């Protein structure tokens, strides 16, 4: 959700197709891993990753994104894809091509008992709670604060907002940096679960785009619901499809085909949403 929220803010408000958003996620994971190795503090790792990637976001917005905003979406796709290639090469130069280890906090390494017969990993539960809290905070920021009103005003009518004294370029810089920091936090939190490696941003970017399309571009609520639906469909598919396929095919075939069909189910869900709600389930208004 954090990655989808950052990207939907940038695309929905700034009208920038930023394929390099996954590279910011990757940068956050690598910085967090490096900080964790040096300090041993996971909290410091997350904070340093967010700040460092936020600084990268400032540089990227001032040097490239601000210029790409004046171009069409094709130029934006090509320009930000070039950033992906550069980021991957920089990561290889600094950390090497091998995956980097990022350990989760020792206090959250075990399970917690949710029900008498149900144990759940404490770290994953923390991520869920953090994601829900972040969703509520972002929704409140965009819809209930003066800064959020200014952001939406700048997105709706830039010229009118400028005439009213709003510094739209500075406002959009803040939105882009916020998106970069959200991606970095997501990378730091998911690093202990997934492998911190070169190209990890591209792997998750497709799913993030699916979440945004399902939920509605520019909508925080839509990004949250889209991420929730994608996660539920993927998890349910991986859990139940192999069981169903074993009724027809051999266990080996069912185990290999089931996860593939679960991934396909995500895109079937997206297609169904686009047929009945072309703007997504919760499109941004105004």
Task: Please describe what each predicted stretch is.
Residues 40-84, 90, 225-230, 234, ...:
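Alpha-helical transmembrane segments within multi-pass membrane transporters and channels
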Residues 40-51, 173-183, 187-188, 193-267:
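Transmembrane alpha-helical segments in multi-pass inner-membrane proteins
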Residues 4-13, 32, 56-62, 83, ...:
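Alpha-helical transmembrane segments of polytopic integral membrane proteins
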Residues 1-35, 61-75, 159, 212-221, ...:
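Single transmembrane alpha-helix segments in multi-pass membrane proteins
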Residues 117-199, 220-226:
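Helix-loop-helix "hairpin" substructures at the membrane interface of multi-pass membrane proteins
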Residues 29-33, 50-56, 83-91, 130-139, ...:
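Hydrophobic core segments of alpha-helical transmembrane domains in multi-pass membrane transport
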Residues 67-68, 73-144, 171, 236-265, ...:
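Transmembrane helix-bundle core of multi-pass membrane transporters
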Residues 13-59, 63, 240, 244-254:
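Membrane-embedded helix boundary and interhelical linker motif in transport proteins
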